[in-house]
Amino acid sequence: MFEVLPLFKSHYSIGKSILTLGSAGSSEETGPDSIIDICSAAKLDHFYLVDDSMTGFMEAYHNASDAGIDLRFGLRLSICNDISLKEKNSNLFEYKCILFCKNKAGYERLLQISSFASTEGFYYNPRIDYK
């Protein structure tokens, strides 16, 4: 049978979501909703957070843990043929991929990949290749 995956993007993916990673009970009636509050209200034991950077991971991890909810984090990356190509049309052939970490070692590897993409591969946005 099919399972619905509780998948969210947070406000750290600038302009793509009004959901925050605030702690349980931080949502306001006239303000943005907390992903943690949504998951708590729906009695979810886990949720998937996919963002374009690692910026909100620790906030999400601590607030989800405090609420007794398991966080499954994914980093959305741009993949190109060659990060050394930084020419006018080189970003036309990029595609997106989501990498999930399942433990601390995976989290540390995502940090390395994200850092590399932001420093070595940056051309309009962080990117990686298969080299």
Which residues does each predicted region cover?
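Phosphodiester-processing cores and adjacent nucleic acid-binding clamps
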Residues: M1-K131
